[in-house]
């Protein structure tokens, strides 16, 4: 619940500041924005809880998170199109959740393509949520 509330505030701030300070247009497909925001938050929250069991202490958490997330950011098309990447990296990116969050949000905000146009992204994100939730329930323990 905290992750979703935090995401709602952040998304609202980015949209409002982007619109009024930088003349960015409002999203073209609000329902798709909502769906992909929620799918992204829930998938990454579940994966975060699952990963938390492997982190030995608070001091090392940033190193573990960065080791997992920074490569994901660079191969998933966060900063540039993945079309110029080698086929191997594109294939890896297609299997990972961030690429599909980016595609869904980009469709909702920029192109107006909705959830039906990104059904593969929905399937991939639901699968990552399910895997993360399963791993979290199976192995996470409060100690």
How should these model regions be labeled?
Residues 2-65, 115-134:
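Alpha-helical transmembrane segments and their short interhelical loops
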Residues 65-68, 93-95:
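Central hydrophobic cores of alpha-helical transmembrane segments
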Residues 1-2, 106:
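Solvent-exposed alpha-helix faces
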Residues 135-143:
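Membrane-interface capping segments at transmembrane-helix boundaries
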Residues 68-75:
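Small-residue-rich segments of transmembrane alpha-helices in multi-pass membrane proteins
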Residues 22-25, 76-131:
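Membrane-interfacial helix-loop-helix junctions in multi-pass membrane proteins
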Residues 15-16, 50, 100, 104, ...:
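A residue-level signal for alpha-helical anchor/packing sites in multi-pass solute transporters
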């Amino acid at each position: 619940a905290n992750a979703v509330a935090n995401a709602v505030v952040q998304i609202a701030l980015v949209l409002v500041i982007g619109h009024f300070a930088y003349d960015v247009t409002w999203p073209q497909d609000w329902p798709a924005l909502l769906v992909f925001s929620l799918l992204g938050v829930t998938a990454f929250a579940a994966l975060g809880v699952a990963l938390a069991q492997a982190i030995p202490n608070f001091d090392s958490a940033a190193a573990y998170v960065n080791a997992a997330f920074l490569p994901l950011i660079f191969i998933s098309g966060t900063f540039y199109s993945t079309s110029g990447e080698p086929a191997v990296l594109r294939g890896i990116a297609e299997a990972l959740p961030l690429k599909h969050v980016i595609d869904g949000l980009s469709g909702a905000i920029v192109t107006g393509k909705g959830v039906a146009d990104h059904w593969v992204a929905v399937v991939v994100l639901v699968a990552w949520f399910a895997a993360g939730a399963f791993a979290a329930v199976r192995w996470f323990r409060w100690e």
